[in-house]
Amino acid sequence: MKKDLKTLALARLSGFRHKTVRVPEWENVSVVLREPSAEAWYLWREVLNDGDTGDEPLSVVAKTRRNLEADVTLFCDVLCDTDLQRVFTADDREQVLVVYGPVHARLLRQALELIADAEAARKK
């Protein structure tokens, strides 16, 4: 049976490229990664601009912390369970920040690559 266009357009994650991946470091669980939302990009930009007064350059430590917080903002937006529900909310960012590591960064990179895939397809 063919679904109608409205149903397809309103389906969860229908507006995002997404893919399912296994995470060996997390007991080989499957997760769904999606492209970041417009809201996440806005919050990411807000984090990067925070503390940039222009008067005095940020220290290396402050820049590193700021960049990590920005990555966590995007990570919390792109990680979904296999029911296509986001795992984290913006309220979880501090908790994720404490444990954010290479596995999280690798998953974020894969989600961001979904955008690059879209750009490559446009060029064809």
Please report, for each region that a protein language model flagged, where it lies by residue.
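Short acidic-hydrophobic surface loop/beta-edge motif
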Residues: 17-27
